[in-house]
From Swiss-Prot:
Residues 39-95 form the 4Fe-4S Mo/W bis-MGD-type domain. The gene is napA. Binds 1 [4Fe-4S] cluster. Binds 1 molybdenum-bis(molybdopterin guanine dinucleotide) (Mo-bis-MGD) cofactor per subunit. It catalyses: 2 Fe(II)-[cytochrome] + nitrate + 2 H(+) = 2 Fe(III)-[cytochrome] + nitrite + H2O. It comes from Pectobacterium atrosepticum (strain SCRI 1043 / ATCC BAA-672) (Erwinia carotovora subsp. atroseptica). The lineage of its organism: Bacteria, Pseudomonadati, Pseudomonadota, Gammaproteobacteria, Enterobacterales. It comes from the Bacteria. This is Periplasmic nitrate reductase. Predicted to be exported by the Tat system. The position of the signal peptide cleavage has not been experimentally proven.
């Protein structure tokens, strides 16, 4: 539908509108509208990045017609970025999928057939047949799911429960493996608990911002607006930016540094050395709250075991470490002198020293921010550990304005992938499948027979690709992501497995993405406020929203899909007799009965829904499904530092930062006076560790898996741009965003282009050892690579950037390094 100019102006001029439970409206903007055509407003977190901005969603006649920044939201305070302004339009692309589609020929499934509309019953029939066949012939390791940091909390929870408890397979992993896994392992190694200790309120209280591999100006623009305000309104505030190329965040930088890829490890160790050599260690903090350990080195690059680099590694995949003394640590970092670090990194000495002084100054509060530059790194866990070292040496942590802060890229990479535990090795609340006690807790809360959850870690994202290609993973469900475009090494390691006749691939998506078109079965999915949902953002803020419109056609939420699919399996289909013998009352029941319609999940009746409140899933199943799942999930974390508030509390507020104890959220963890888990007199307690102490790790600089050589003479890096989000499957369907940045380009230094007789605007072939892509030369614009490096975003489905990238991963986190491989260029 089209809005009249009068309605458009009314919808966008007000700071907030409509009296909805939990939303307060400033008196000045409570303008009455005609009841017959009034826009109804309700709150929701933004659908895009991990900042977690609050928006007001305006609906009219069953459609979303407007959105605006929520002035009551503490994250964004009424602001939106350019993507947030166009949220309504992501819902209504002309090619929106509205019914299941199966590859068919002559009325039957055929992997080489054409996509044909079918019913949900038929879709689940063939899906169940393929999953049951794989389970019967090869067991739980033959099935898998690739989920998302964009799934709602209960969608992720239901998926993990279905696979780990129902199918007894840990082969479920989220696309957050590609972006946040190194941060997770880094947090766990250093602190014993995941996620940042600080919050966004640090921005207004700090003296210095240091960005490590993070272009916040484009990737986290609302937070960047707050940083900009802090910097420009306070002359004593400093901004330092480190990256492998110049980008828009450099425009605000007092100290902008471009370093050679992978050498951030050396810079981090140099800063630690500078702190020690200049007597800037916070002795009182360090002595009481820190342990030291030496990590194993030469750990490989997460490639296939047959790869020469893996064969050559002395300790492939090892996360082992041993205690060390301060004197030993001092000697270790002493090797990273200013002169050596300049030689390795290419950063001028005066800039490195200025950065080190910033951290060492006891009068300066410092925040370190990072995203994919650290995490998508073959030593990403080490990079995370090393930046924690700096904050632990100086005691600049867990206090207002001070701390290390890992930013997230997806709206619920924290709340769903990490906190719920949709990784192949995790359970809710930082528990892991390899820990017998953790499995026992999960089995008790889920009312499962002892031994149901397998102890072996499942296949991570890249391992899933390899298993599909090798024919050992045969039934595969991809949900809420576009991994065929977003994952690495497409032609060699992913596409072959998807099109292998031994495998059956299901993709749940609202649009015909590259992934959907490569699948065998496409399930049309409800988006954003077409369902009730919850996200958890980067500052541990859990935010809820209500369903506000119905999904088009036969589209169904991912939660409905998971729960409904569970009805197709009896416990006898998936559990051995030794498990059934422990729970004879379960015989003959479906996984739906046991996992999703038990006495815990069904305890909240439909009467708890507000009158006329949309909630398609709950009304179909006959109970308040989301509330039942959330309260069951929350039981994992309450009482040991992961406390979530009661379900109903979140509908009344703009989110709460966990742990939430006695109704009060926590802004700064691990410090006395801020964290309810730190007792009086303790000052700090890193209670994720048994002794309450954080760990400083001695870890060296090690080179990248692939670097330029005589033939492939350029570094290649990929990432995002402001206007588009990830693979562009939503933003490229917004005409304004598409026009703003219609196609991917190759950013290159003018002298590198000239040396290859390439001119701006010309087409160019980018060639790696894995494939090639044609793009357009760009020697100007927002991104300015140094000589020897090129940068290309991956949002453009017509230019499959990740054909080029290497599937090397951090051996500890299994996260892919999208930032470093070698390419050469050729004229077209």
């Amino acid at each position: 539908m089209k809005l009249s100019r009068r309605h458009f102006m009314k919808a966008n001029a007000v700071a907030a509108a409509a009296a909805v439970a939990g939303i307060t409206i400033p008196i000045a903007v409570r303008a009455a509208t005609e009841q017959s055509d009034a826009i109804h407003w309700d709150k929701a977190p933004c659908r895009f990045c991990g900042v977690g901005c609050g928006v007001l969603v305006g609906t009219q006649n069953g459609r979303i017609v407007a959105s605006q920044g929520d002035p009551e939201a503490p994250v964004n305070r009424g602001l939106n970025c350019i993507k947030g302004y166009f949220l309504p339009k992501i819902m209504y692309g002309q090619d929106r999928l509205t019914q299941p589609l199966l590859r068919m020929r002559n009325g039957q499934f055929d992997k080489e057939g054409e996509f044909t509309p079918i019913s949900w019953d038929k879709a689940f029939d063939i899906m169940a047949e393929k999953f049951k066949t794989a389970l019967k012939e090869k067991g739980p390791n033959a099935i898998g799911m690739f989920g998302s940091g964009q799934s709602t909390i209960w969608e992720g929870y239901a998926s993990a429960k279905l696979f780990k408890a129902g199918f007894r397979s840990n082969n479920i992993d989220p696309n957050a493996r590609h972006c946040m896994a190194s941060a997770v392992v880094g947090f766990m190694r250093t602190f014993g608990m995941d996620e940042p200790m600080g919050c966004y309120d640090d921005i207004e209280q700090t003296d210095a911002f240091v960005l490590w591999g993070s272009n916040m100006a484009e990737m986290h623009p609302i937070l960047w607006s707050r940083i900009t305000d802090r910097r420009l309104s306070n002359s004593n505030v400093t901004v330092a930016v480190l990256s492998t190329y110049q980008h828009r965040s450099f425009e605000l930088a007092d100290n902008g540094m471009v370093f050679t890829p992978q050498t951030d490890l050396a810079i981090l160790n140099y800063i630690a050395n500078y702190i020690i050599q200049n007597n800037a260690v916070n002795e009182a903090f360090f002595t009481r709250h820190v342990n030291l350990r030496r990590g194993v080195t030469d750990i490989g690059y997460g490639l296939r075991p047959t790869h020469p680099l893996e064969k050559a590694a002395k300790n492939p995949g090892s996360d082992a470490s041993e205690p060390m003394s301060f004197e030993e640590y001092k000697a270790f970092v002493a090797d990273y002198t200013l002169e050596k670090t300049v030689a390795i990194s290419g950063v001028p000495a005066d800039q490195l020293e200025a950065l080190a002084k910033l951290y060492a100054d006891p009068k300066k509060k410092v925040i370190s921010y990072w995203t994919m530059g650290f995490n998508q790194h073959t030593r990403g866990v080490w990079a995370n550990n090393l930046v924690y070292n700096i904050h632990l040496l100086t005691g600049k942590i867990s206090q207002p304005g001070c701390g290390p802060f890992s930013l997230t890229g997806q709206p619920s990479a924290c709340g769903t992938a990490r906190e719920v535990g949709t990784f192949a090795h995790r359970l809710p609340a930082d528990m892991v499948v390899t820990n017998e006690k953790h499995r026992a807790i999960a089995e008790k809360l889920w009312q499962l027979p002892t031994g149901t959850i397998p102890e072996k870690i499942g296949l991570h994202a890249v391992a899933q690709d390899r298993a599909l290609k090798d024919g050992t993973l045969n039934a595969y469900w991809v949900m809420c992501n576009n991994n065929m475009q977003a994952g690495p090494n497409i032609n060699q390691e992913r596409m072959p497995g998807w099109r292998d006749p031994r495998n059956f691939i299901v993709v749940s998506d609202p649009y015909p993405t590259i992934s959907a078109l490569a699948a065998d079965l496409i399930l049309p999915t409800a988006m954003w406020v077409e369902k009730e949902g919850a996200y958890g953002n980067a500052e541990r803020r859990t935010q809820f929203w209500r369903q506000q419109v119905k999904a088009p056609g036969e589209s169904k939420s991912d939660l409905w899909q998971v729960v409904s699919f569970a009805k197709r399996f009896t416990v006898e289909d998936v559990w051995p007799e030794e498990l059934l013998a422990q729970k004879p009352a379960y015989r003959g029941k479906t996984l739906y009965d046991v996992l999703f319609a038990n006495d815990v999940t069904t305890r909240f009746p439909l009467s708890e829904l507000a009158e006329n409140q949309l909630n398609d899933e709950s009304r179909e199943f006959g109970f308040y499904l989301q509330k039942g799942l959330f309260e069951e999930y929350a039981a994992f974390g309450r009482g040991h530092g992961h406390d979530l508030a009661p379900f109903d509390a979140y509908h009344k507020v703009r989110g709460l930062r966990w742990p939430v104890v006695d109704g009060k959220e926590t802004q700064w963890r691990y410090s006395e006076g801020h964290d309810p888990y730190v007792k009086a007199g303790e000052a700090y307690r890193f209670y994720g560790k048994p002794d309450g102490k954080a760990v400083i790790f001695a870890l060296p600089y090690e080179p990248a898996a692939e670097a330029p050589d005589e033939e492939y003479d350029l570094w290649f890096s990929t990432g995002r741009v402001l206007e588009h989000w990830h693979t562009g499957s939503m933003t490229r369907r917004v005409p304004e965003l598409h026009r703003a940045f219609p196609e991917a380009v190759l950013f290159i230094h003018p002298q590198d282009a000239k040396a290859r007789d390439l001119r701006r605007g010309e087409k160019v072939r980018i060639i790696s050892r894995r494939g090639e892509v044609i793009s357009v030369v760009e020697t100007r614009g927002r991104n300015k690579p140094p000589r020897g490096l090129v940068y290309m975003p991956f949002f453009d489905a017509a230019q499959m950037t990740n054909v080029l990238t290497l599937d090397a991963t951090d051996p500890l986190s299994k996260e892919t390094d999208f930032k470093k491989c070698a390419v050469k260029l050729a004229k077209v």
